[in-house]
Amino acid sequence: MLNILKKLYNDDKRELKKFEKYANKVEGYADEMSKLTDEQLQAKTPEFRERIKKGESLDDLLPEAFAVAREGAKRVLGLYPFHVQILGGIALHFGNIAEMMTGEGKTLTATMPVYLNALEGKGVHVVTVNEYLSSRDEEEMGQLYKWLGLTVGLNLNSMSPDEKREAYNCDVTYSTNSELGFDYLRDNMVVYKEQMVQRPLNYAIIDEVDSILIDEARTPLIISGEAEQANSDYIRADRFVKNLSEDKSDDDVDDDEDYGDYKIDWPTKTISLTRTGIEKACKHFGLRNLYDVENQKLVHHIDQALRANYIMLKDIDYVVQDGEVLIVDSFTGRVMEGRRYSDGLHQAIEAKEGVKIQEESKTQATITYQNFFRMYKKLSGMTGTAKTEEEEFREIYNMQVITIPTNRPIARKDMPDILYPTLDSKFHAVVEEIKKRHANGQPVLVGTVAIESSERLSHLLDEAGIPHAVLNAKNHAKEAQIIMNAGQRGAVTIATNMAGRGTDIKLGPGVKELGGLAVIGTERHESRRIDNQLRGRSGRQGDPGYTRFYLSLEDDLMKRFGGDRVKDFLDRLSDNDDDKVIESRLITRQVESAQKRVEGNNYDIRKQTLQYDDVMRIQREIIYGERMQVIDADKSLKNVLIPMIHRTIDSQVDMFTQGDRSEWRLDSLRDFISSSLTSEQVTDSIDFKTISVEDLKKKLYDIVEKNFEDKEKALGDPSQMLEFEKVVILRVVDDRWTDHIDAMDQLRQSIGLRGYGQLNPLVEYQDSGYRMFEEMISNIEFDVTRLFMKAEIRQNISR
């Protein structure tokens, strides 16, 4: 392990050394650029583009182009990138992650690689976590790019396809990660090429890259259509599970007895019925066997009702507002507008909370951020905290994390954690600490992990008469404004996790003298990176600052991972005094060890997600590629359709003519021919008693050929025939693909059970997924055969 760390450290140093050489060359152009007139500086853009056309590479242009962007920033924005920002920009250009501390000017850093890469004219996407940041950065930094002769676009959720297309056709496009992903999926659902909005994915710079590629890696982007579903099923399942009790016995108990109706595995957040629970379900619903095939839907509803009632926590995982269940992002603490849990979980939570149950949706297209961003030709990112996830970035995205030095030394004091026996004693201590600092006028930012904690603390501060602002998923409309004011004298701000990320906290007048911004964490997050983000809110650009985490044995992390050892240790020291505070290296080590375990666990889950999603990725790329060829076609698709129909004929005829002629299933064969290929009259004219298999196939091929010619004559216009062919293929492919996505999702959820049979679930998923994909292709060809052969020709066919 030590050797790996040493190697990473050396790689980092080696890369920085290489970047230093480039940075010095950029600095070497500074005088030359400063002497140019505005017109001469602006003329550099067409000059660079001409040089690229003649074969000069972006790497060759880097020093001069960076110097142009740097000088342009000074003239247009009044900001001149420091040497460390040039280093960060170089790291981004070479497809790395630039780890830069809060307040080190990541937005300005990105202008240089954005300018350089935009010169190719293939499009650069600057990706942010929300539309506020996209709009802000496009407005501010867009001035520079426009001044330098580039086009700049902003891609928003509310825009029409025409507006989006215009934004994507610009040299530089600002967008959120979700909008990029959804536009990609929508582009692969269109039926006319002109409806597409995106160009091929070229280069992206992701701001807050850890938030998007790590925290949201497992979040699939889903485009859904409504599916029929009886809401009463959710209510029945909900009523049943509400009367169950948890089995809290240890896993290592040897007896076969159940101690409750369901069991929860908290580290993986999985829940299942025990045998007692299964017996209760059979009795409650009047069944002989809960797991009979016909009870599949009921089992699904019970599973989701269990998750909704005992795993999903109100005000932590979701909130209820105006009779609606809204998901809370566990990393940002924000409500995820318009996002719904899939597969009926959202409806199960609605049943649990007694609000109106909305229709279950059917997935039409889906992709994870992991697989979407891996499609870019070049990818880079910026964040203040990525080093703890370095291995994941390298393994999954092939990106190295380069720690960029700060422009000024860090003056912030990071104090050791302190631990209390109970939540009450911890919150009491936090309020006292805030009171003391507030009395001196020092601004305080308090970080909480859950909405529940922020509201509890807010109530305690109200009782203490301390004015404060609360920033959580319930009121994020003004979050940027609240965060901007958090550094003013006397300000007390409570923030759930990293709400307001991307907005700097600047210190107000006289605050430096008071010790800068004090950051108090009320709980350790399961990821060290999120804790580091909270710390990084204080001490920007060499400012003074103070940070400390207050913990209790009743914190979620302590309860879930290894709290017993700490509790024993505390019992020995504390003499049963609830207000006794413990500062010990053991506590810090135990917390960090728990965090590392959770991080390792989460990484394994994300890696596994990717392995499973790779099966769908390959299938998705095949379907989307074939679809695009159909949409793009400008001449007859006969050479695609005829082989599809021939394969269908071959498989169906072979299936019905196995064995001796006496064993042939002639009735089924006749049905296939008359229902899928031709009329009953033509079918009756075939002498099935004497014809050979090969002659039958040839006869059917001839019928297909004649049908094709008849349709061409009926339409008269080759473009109309092409349109008809496209309609047939696209309708069938889209219907079958949508069904396949659902089937693969159900396979994914059921596959874990096969692990009990000593089988590798991933291998089983890959094998079953491959078979299902082949079956889907076969079904597509069968449906295309029937639709093409039996469809009546009409003018003005609509896709």
From Swiss-Prot:
Compartment list: Cell membrane; Cytoplasm
SMART domains assigned to the protein according to its UniProt record, in alphabetical order: SecA_DEAD, SecA_PP_bind
Protein's membrane topology: Peripheral membrane protein
Keywords, ordered alphabetically: ATP-binding, Cell membrane, Cytoplasm, Membrane, Nucleotide-binding, Protein transport, Translocase, Translocation, Transport
A biological process term (GO) from this entry: intracellular protein transmembrane transport
PROSITE patterns in the record: SECA (PS01312), SECA_MOTOR_DEAD (PS51196)
GO CC entries: cell envelope Sec protein transport complex; cytosol; plasma membrane
InterPro entries, A to Z: Helicase_ATP-bd, Helicase_C-like, P-loop_NTPase, SecA, SecA_CS, SecA_DEAD, SecA_motor_DEAD, SecA_preprotein_X-link_dom
SUPFAM superfamilies hit by this protein: Helical scaffold and wing domains of SecA, P-loop containing nucleoside triphosphate hydrolases, Pre-protein crosslinking domain of SecA
Top-level lineage group: Bacteria
GO molecular function: ATP binding; protein-exporting ATPase activity
The reaction(s) this protein catalyses: ATP + H2O + cellular proteinSide 1 = ADP + phosphate + cellular proteinSide 2
CDD domains: DEXDc_SecA, SF2_C_secA
Pfam families (UniProt xref): P-loop_SecA, SecA_DEAD, SecA_PP_bind, SecA_SW
Residues where ATP binds: Q85, G103, E104, G105, K106, T107, D504
Purpose of the protein: Part of the Sec protein translocase complex. Interacts with the SecYEG preprotein conducting channel. Has a central role in coupling the hydrolysis of ATP to the transfer of proteins into and across the cell membrane, serving as an ATP-driven molecular motor driving the stepwise translocation of polypeptide chains across the membrane.
Similarity comment text for this entry: Belongs to the SecA family.
Name of this chain's protein: Protein translocase subunit SecA
Source organism (scientific name): Lactobacillus helveticus (strain DPC 4571)
